[in-house]
Amino acid sequence: MRVVFFLVILISNWLCFSQEISTEFVTKIPLDADTFVGVDDLGNIYYLQNNTLHKKEVDKVYSYTNTLLGKITSVDIKNPLKILVFYRDFNTILFLDNRLNELTNPINFLEESIAKNMNAISLSSNNNLWMYSSDDNTLALWNHQSKKTIFTSQPLQFYKENFKPTSIVSSYKEVCIFNNETALFFNEFGAYINNISLNKTDQLHYNNNQLFGVEENTIYQYQNGLSKKVRLSDKDISIKSFYVNKDHLYIFDGSSIFVFKFLKI
């Protein structure tokens, strides 16, 4: 009987441990920023300060600002050679190169007769953009070169009752549209996959088709309907924002970036 009890405890502890992802602390980088955007494959840091986008390399900082388009809503650095900047107040996007020079003229969705209220946008592949508009509460895939809509979903309440999202994140294979309670997933062709429940999550990031989010100051990985806690190697950090790139996790606490390496994902 004691042996059985011991085995139950051992298995329970193993299961709990298996639901965690271990990390090791790498370094701490001071950063004076209003918003930490992320880090690209070369270790360059992107951030917002005074409504200006900055890219910090080892020995140089590039900057971009556009006072005519209002406040920057979001920046997508998935492709560092084609950075997407979204200005929600003016219903406008533009693309920047790796030195933060404009690649395109601003694209105004009202002028393109797409939507009056574009709320969230994320990069896809092949010059496509995932877009959410509160006008009709749908998710759309739009090609910014051909100016054609490739896919439009059903109204999102069709997939989840009373669902009204606040943001979008995507990989090149999948898109996640979410609020702080629910996330809906669609594949690259617009087919609905599933949905998961979240716990007060306001930040999600894809990394190699794996989704990470922060809930109550703890980072989790979501995969196959399960969540795994990311253990920050005994560091107690107030998570203002975070970013995941390959095998590294970057956490911004408002004054510094804490860099961790995943021991196993």
Q: What is the role of each PLM region?
A:
Residues V26-D32, S63-L68, I107-I114, T152-E161, ...:
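Surface loop/turn motifs at the tips and blade-to-blade linkers of beta-strand repeat domains
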Residues L31-D40, L69-I77, I114-S122, K160-V169, ...:
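Repeated scaffold domains used in trafficking and secretory/extracellular systems
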Residues K56-K60, D97-N101, N143-S146, N187-A191, ...:
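Short loop/turn segments that connect beta-strands within beta-propeller blades
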Residues E20-K82, R88-F90:
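Start-of-domain marker
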Residues M1-F25, I265:
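Bacterial Sec-dependent N-terminal signal peptides
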